[in-house]
Amino acid sequence: MSTGGATTPSEGWNRFWFRQIPPHVYAVLRIAFGVLCLLDLLGATPISMFWDLNGIAPLPGGGPLGFRSWVVASGFAPAAAWMVFTGTLLAYLCMTLGIGGNAAVIASLVAHVWQTAWNVLPLSAAHQVLTAVLFSLVWADCGQVLTVSPLQNAVTPALRQSIAPLRVLQYQVCLIYFSSGVSKFSSELWRDGSAIYYAMSHNIVQRFPLDVVPLSFQGVATLTTYGTLVFELAFPFLVAWRRTRVLTLLAGVGLHLGAWVTLEVGPFSWVMIATYIAFLPPERLATLVDEVWQRKAARYRPSTPSQGL
């Protein structure tokens, strides 16, 4: 997140927001979040429970002009849940595999937002983060590399893309952490260091059933509470500085893995870890992806028999 090499403020601004980068980082983000969207969708099953008009989250709009009334009147009510679920599933699959290019990413964003309108569940904050990521990706060409399309994979070299969508995603991640830290700081439980201890004692969010969390754990819980608070408030500043970026991202991975191991937070931990891809150096990531892709292609390329004289 630096302007490296700029000689004037104007050049620094243009380099920071608009310099051209390899498209590989967008492709990796597309695949990672395509998989996460699929997992998030499959978590809202069985379909009859989560998607049916009369499931645990009934479709709203039952008035004379409501959407629910329109679906019932159209005659599609028995199949509506399957139609919406299947359409969303296909959009996510196409995005993950790179089929349809940006059209698949746009369709995934529409389907993801539509899922919230159709079904007020899931309750995980991961859904909101996924929406923010998909919004950032629609502004970049994510389908140039790492696709199942032979035509796309034959494009050499891949066209470079503006870094602007990546910057938007980076700032959204920073805003997520900072706003979460401010919200936590307004809670007395976070200020007195007891939030993690009480979360571990809560039978709804605790992953392992503990009737009583041992008092010996209280010191660790207090340290973890304050550490989480400091990390979230400081994340935007630490990740912006190159010298502390790697350590900050590693600390974030540890934080989210710890939360996933001890608490029922849904896919949120994995979604946030995946956003760290946006902070990796695009050029180095492109080199690594190309090396892995070429090595894989060489492994499956049929060998050419040697020609005799």
Features from the language model and the residues they span:
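Alpha-helical membrane-anchoring segments
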Residues: M1-L309
